[in-house]
């Protein structure tokens, strides 16, 4: 028998082409009259957002836009958005953009009803009060943040990425419309695509995996195997874009209800120290961490390889695991994922940050969910391998 698992996902999920057309009625259903729109400088100026704003206005819903979210959202973003929300007396938040905008929106929504600083709630289930309604519209097929009870915000005073996990962070509604992803540039498609695979893989091999998250994780992995390369080579392929959008959402449902592991634990310090986008740092680390981990969960990792189509179902677990590691390296090369040394990180700066990054990674708790739990020295070696 297995232990009970607690699953958190949004109460309303709209999926498919035209899903964003349901935003107005859904916001109205929650009794929200004035929204704070949370986005980044690029997405805040797109025709897609203008279309949404016009629909909201036609439905009698007012809005004000905070469009300054940075690629890795900070506590400063949350404070700026919160100040605007209070100034205009908004009673709901609509996050429009990639995972950064959605994560920032989550922070703003819960801090609208809770006191103190966001850093007070770093960790698990520490937010006392439910936030104001949050509506999430992802525009990248990547983080799956629209489905999760997780936000990751950088504490700028400590140079630490805070992982905050709490049911109060789950959006009230998510609108997963793959037509928003057609204009994603190739590098972003690659970064968030391999990030999506990381979510599915880590959720599946996590020590906290359960029967429900296994279903979401395997679906995520299968969709990535079918569609990532096609989406990268043919950005206007609707089937590939839809498949990757579903993969991202399923990956989010999976990892938020099982947990991420060593890749994410090591990725956050990289982002905090060197301002690497979350998806890119995950993608860079995935092959090395998988090579390190496979011996401790061969059955699970071999299933991942077979689900991706990289190994035959008749092959041994060891053969499939070997093909998984080589396949991840080949995937990164094929979609032009760089090494850390190619990301404007000098060897001197990298070595000076190595101890702190390893310590922060281990302290995050995520490595303890990994099939093979690393030591501090192991983490340092893995950083060096990825460099």
Feature locations, PLM:
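Active-site segments that bind and position negatively charged phosphate/pyrophosphate groups
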Residues: 203-330
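Short glycine/serine/threonine-rich phosphate/pyrophosphate-binding segments
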Residues: 20-23, 45-48, 75-78, 100-106, ...
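N-terminal small/polar loop signature for handling phosphorylated ligands or for N-terminal nucleophile
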Residues: 44-117, 230-241
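Mobile late-domain/C-terminal helix-loop "cap" segments
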Residues: 287-387
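A glycine/threonine-rich phosphate-anchoring loop and its flanking beta-alpha core
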Residues: 11, 113-209, 300-307
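Glycine-rich phosphate/diphosphate-binding loops that line cofactor/substrate pockets in enzymes
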Residues: 21-36, 54-59, 87, 334
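N-terminal amphipathic/basic leader segments beginning at the initiator methionine
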Residues: 1-30
């Amino acid at each position: 028998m297995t232990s009970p698992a607690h699953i958190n996902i949004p109460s309303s999920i709209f999926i498919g082409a035209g899903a964003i057309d349901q935003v107005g009625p859904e916001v109205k259903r929650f009794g929200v009259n004035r929204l704070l729109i949370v986005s980044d400088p690029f997405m805040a100026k797109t025709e897609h957002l203008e279309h949404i704003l016009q629909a909201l206005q036609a439905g009698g819903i007012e809005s004000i836009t905070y469009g300054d979210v940075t690629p890795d959202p900070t506590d400063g973003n949350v404070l700026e958005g919160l100040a605007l929300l209070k100034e205009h007396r908004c009673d709901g938040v609509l996050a429009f953009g990639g995972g950064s905008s959605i994560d920032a929106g989550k922070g703003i929504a819960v801090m609208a009803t809770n006191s103190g600083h966001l850093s007070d709630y770093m960790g698990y289930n520490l937010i006392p009060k439910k936030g104001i309604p949050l509506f999430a519209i992802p525009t990248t097929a990547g983080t799956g943040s629209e489905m999760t009870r997780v936000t990751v915000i950088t504490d700028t005073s400590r140079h630490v990425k805070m992982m905050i996990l709490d049911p109060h962070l789950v959006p009230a509604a998510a609108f997963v419309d793959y037509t928003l992803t057609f204009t994603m540039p190739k590098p972003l498609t690659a970064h968030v695509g391999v990030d999506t695979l990381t979510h599915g893989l880590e959720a599946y091999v996590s020590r906290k995996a359960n029967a429900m998250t296994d279903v979401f994780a395997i679906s995520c992995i299968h969709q990535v195997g079918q569609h990532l390369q096609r989406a990268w080579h043919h950005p206007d392929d609707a089937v590939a874009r839809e498949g990757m959008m579903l993969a991202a959402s399923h990956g989010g449902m999976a990892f938020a209800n099982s947990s991420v592991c060593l890749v994410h634990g090591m990725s956050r310090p990289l982002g905090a120290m060197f301002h690497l986008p979350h998806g890119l740092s995950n993608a860079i680390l995935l092959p090395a961490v998988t090579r390190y981990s496979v011996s401790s969960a061969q059955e699970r990792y071999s299933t991942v390889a077979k689900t991706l189509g990289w190994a035959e179902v008749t092959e041994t677990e060891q053969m499939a695991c070997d093909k998984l590691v080589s396949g991840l390296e080949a995937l990164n090369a094929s979609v032009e994922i760089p090494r850390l040394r190619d990301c404007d990180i000098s060897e001197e700066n990298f070595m000076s940050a190595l101890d702190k990054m390893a310590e922060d990674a281990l302290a995050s708790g995520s490595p303890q969910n990994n099939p093979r739990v690393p030591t501090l020295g192991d983490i340092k070696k893995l950083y060096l391998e990825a460099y």
